[in-house]
Each structure stands twice: as C-alpha cells, then as structure tokens.
Amino acid sequence: MKRLPAGIISTLLSLTMTLTPCSMSALAAQENSRDFSLFFSGPGVAALSSGDEYSEYQWALNNTGRLRRTEKVLNIKTLDHIYLHYGENGIDDIALPPLGPDNFESINTDAVANIDINIEDAWKTYSETENKRTVTVAIIDTGIDTTHSDLKDSIWVNEDEIPGDGIDNDGNGYVDDVNGWNFVSNSNEICTGEEDSHGTHGAGTIAAAWNNGGIAGITNSTHVKLMVLKALGGSEGKGSPESVIEAIKYAEANGADICNLSFGSSNCTPEFEAAIRDSKMLFVVAAGNGNQYQIGYDIDKSPVDPASLPYDNVITVGNLLFNGHLDESSNYGATSVDLAAPGTYILSTIPGDSYAYMSGTSMAAPMVTGAAALIYSARTDLSLQDIKTAILSTVHKLAPLKGKTATGGMLDVSAAIKWTKN
C-alpha cells in the first residue's frame, strides 16, 4: 500500500473536522515582468467507485458537504481604499499599507453537498461508450514525475525515439525526447525533483490511474496520455515566453490535442499570443491568483495572459471553493473567465511517489483539462471546439458565479458528456 508522508496523513485524518491552509507558500500570481509564474498556493469525503484508497479525500470529485475550513483571512473592509483605486491604476501603482492584526479575521467555510464536478455519472456514460480514441494532453508547466505509480502508465511515449541511445532518432532536433522535453535546461531531463511538484500535481488530477490504491484522475491511462513539457523551473517556477512558445510548437508537432497552461504573466509577447491563437490545440488556462495579498481581481479590466486572451481555442478557469463560491484568491471576469472548477485543497500526486494538497487556479484548470480529454476521447465524431461548447453549455449554474464568469457556473462533466450525445 502506498503511504503518504506523515504530515499529509495527519491532515487527511482531520479532514472531517477542520481544514487548515496548506503550508506551501503562495507564488506571486502576476509579476511586473515578461516571465510566466505559476498559479498555486499552498483538502470530499466519500470514496469513489474507482476503488482508489485516497479518493475519499478528493472532494472535487464527490463532495458530501462534510468539510469545514478554518482560517485567518484579510478583512476586506479595512482595505476598501485599495479596491477604489485598483480599477483606475492597476495593482502595480498602488501603495499598499502595512498589515497588522486588525486587518485579519478568523472565518469558517463549510462545504455544500454536491458542489463537485459530477464525475461518477460521467464515468458510467464513458464506460458505456464504444470506439474511444486516444487523446494526447500536453502539460506545459514544471516537469512531471513520470515514475510515480499513479502516473507512469499515463505518460505519452514518442514511439519514434529509442530511449537512451543519445541519438535524435526521429530527427526533430530533440535527442531522446521519449516522454517530452525540458525547455528550461534544453535537455530530456523532465523531472528534477521537488521543483516539479506543480506539474506533477496537475498531471494527477487529469490522469492518475484508477483502482491502484492512490487517487483517481478524471481520465485514465487507457485513452489519455500526458506529454511532459517542462517550460518553467527553479524554486519559484518561472519561465520565459520563448520557452513556452517552443513547447507549444513541440506539442503541435507531436500530435497533442489539448494543452494545460496553469501559469500566466501580466506582460506577454505578441509572439506568445500568436502561438496560442494559431494553434489547433484546445488550451485550458488558469485565471490567476490575484495580487500580492492573494486577493483575486477582474481580469477583464486588468488582463493577464493567457487567461484574458479572447480566442476560440481557450477556456479560462477560476478556482471554486467547496461551498460554491469563488475562492477569495481567484481572479474573475464576466468575459475573460469562462467557468469555475474546484481548485482549493486539491489532493494529487507530487514527486517521490507521494501526494499533497495544493490550492489555486493552477489546480482548477486541470479539472477542465481532464474533462475535455474524457469527452473528446468518448466522442470521436466531434471537434475540440465542440468539446469546448459542450463544457460551457452545461455548467452547473451557481448564483455567486453570476457576473464573475461568462457562464455563471462550474464544471459538470456528466452534463457535458451527455450533452454531446443529444
């Protein structure tokens, strides 16, 4: 039986009582530079039919309403002047005051039953579908631990490359790119350890193996494969537009269908925007985690790339709490953000055959990526644009999301896959 690190186990055991925020530090969501930054910070309690031991802690897949989060948060009322000026000047122009005890308050957040992506019914529909196709999902992120027992069977393989012979067998300019490429170090070393937790976590949400004792991915390894494209690295998960552009081109050249982008920048290049606009892939993008105080803002007014790009091949995702509200840190936008998906206290894979909770729009985007891959695999007669339409046309409407997202709702995988059959 796989075992979680001791600290994670103790967190799991306390889930039905009180949740405390993940100890992992939040990375800045938007930087005043051209570099990309990751969108994460930082746990459902009913076992899924997949038969995975830790699936009972995946509230995003089956929310029974038994969770509570207790935390200290910023008291918005004490910061009203920030919001009054924000729309005019942008966050970089605001002189923020020092924060003291009076700026914070303790609050409880209780889960609401059925605020989840409705995956069980979707799996049933998927299992009844014949003639599925294999879908390749490119994850442009930090690296991914391809040896993780919950991921190893879901990793894409370049069949034209002979592993370890030091020769560029397929002549594509990348030597021994068996599972993807590291565009940070220009090598085939696609996992270097702890710094690749972010990408590994997203990979587990999308396609962790079913019925093997770990967690359950939205899809499984039979018909969905993950292409590992490391374009961000270092302790803060930074990367250049040039690296991401090269990764996009690699993904296209090697047959990727869907691309997950859980990062962003407030100052991207025209070349980067064109790379997405001109691609045939469907991009699922994280909306971003707000300002330096982790308070989300309107990206219709203060755009973030690629989340604010108005292209037909982009789906932008906000971070939904287990009570049906956007997380305070999640960016929003009645035009730019298409829908919300669970992104707070998401349990998934990390390097070293381990598991951890993370929170942020980086965790929400892979939920939609996994859903898109599942539906696209099931419906061989539909285009990727059809899949986007299905997902956005069938959201679970939630009053708190009205005016915050274009659809006013959250991801409903079952409704989306059934919609495609009508």
Where are these regions (language model features)?
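C-terminal segment of classical bacterial N-terminal signal peptides
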Residues: T16-A26
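Protease zymogen maturation seam
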Residues: L27-T136, I144-D150, K421
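C-terminal subdomain of the subtilisin-like protease fold in secreted/lumenal serine endopeptidases
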Residues: S37, A216, N254-L261, N313-T316, ...
